[in-house]
Amino acid sequence: MERFITWLARLQLAIGTLALVIFVAATLLQVLARYLNISVLWTEEVAVNAFIWAIFSGAAVMVREKKHFSFNALAMKLTGRTRLALVLFEQSVMLVFCVLCAFYSVEITDTFWHSKWVTLPSLQQGYVWLVLPVSFATSSLYLLEGMLKEIRVCVKREKPAWS
């Protein structure tokens, strides 16, 4: 299972990186077009939507790396069951948030699925909104993985991987 989750995180990071490249390319094209006094209408919308994909894809991977939201300063000072309780509480709160967001973002994605892009009406907005349930679902998976790792560390009395 860990191999699959690692593969999934790498895929998500690759998608986020590609989206960031598209964002930069669209932004540079927009700047160049303005400099040359040429009207390229679609670059702004492509840049914004690519940026959304880059941010949400990267945020999910950062949840797995424990670099997105954490109270590490306090957790690093605690040991044993006290540290485990704090870390599990923190990750449980995040998990509830991510599961709720995943659930409701499916509804949002469904609602806006057939909306069209303003400058590229052949494209559907649903593909942009799809990043929400994907990133929140994978964040939930990464949080569950992290919680299981923390429990294993405490049970085996090993040193945490992040310290």
Description of each model-found segment:
Residues 1-163:
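Alpha-helical transmembrane segments and membrane-interface helix-loop junctions
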